[in-house]
Amino acid sequence: MAKEDTLEFPGVVKELLPNATFRVELDNGHELIAVMAGKMRKNRIRVLAGDKVQVEMTPYDLSKGRINYRFK
């Protein structure tokens, strides 16, 4: 899948789930399950409940996403 096919939305981490997954509520009210991107894991960027993040999603499955940036 090409990078252009992804959708990016800002959101807030609501809950930490097992296996490095997170429940994220987007700014438009939609809620989804997200995992951290590999570069964030590699650089040991911590994500906690209440953090504002940017979530990347595919148009084929809007219930799952990937956290690719944590806002400061």
Curated annotation (Swiss-Prot):
Matches recorded under Pfam families: eIF-1a
Keyword RNA-binding: yes
Gene3D superfamilies, per database record: Nucleic acid-binding proteins
CDD domains: S1_IF1
Record bears the keyword Cytoplasm: yes
Main location: cytoplasm
UniProt-recorded Gene Ontology molecular function terms: ribosome binding; rRNA binding; translation initiation factor activity
A GO-annotated cellular component: cytosol
Swiss-Prot/TrEMBL keywords: Cytoplasm, Initiation factor, Protein biosynthesis, RNA-binding, rRNA-binding
Localization, UniProt: Cytoplasm
Domain S1-like, residue spans: 1-72
PANTHER family given in the database record: TRANSLATION INITIATION FACTOR IF-1, CHLOROPLASTIC
Function comment: One of the essential components for the initiation of protein synthesis. Stabilizes the binding of IF-2 and IF-3 on the 30S subunit to which N-formylmethionyl-tRNA(fMet) subsequently binds. Helps modulate mRNA selection, yielding the 30S pre-initiation complex (PIC). Upon addition of the 50S ribosomal subunit IF-1, IF-2 and IF-3 are released leaving the mature 70S translation initiation complex.
Family as reported in the entry's similarity comment: Belongs to the IF-1 family.
Quaternary structure, from the entry: Component of the 30S ribosomal translation pre-initiation complex which assembles on the 30S ribosome in the order IF-2 and IF-3, IF-1 and N-formylmethionyl-tRNA(fMet); mRNA recruitment can occur at any time during PIC assembly.
Protein's name according to its UniProt entry: Translation initiation factor IF-1
The encoding gene: infA
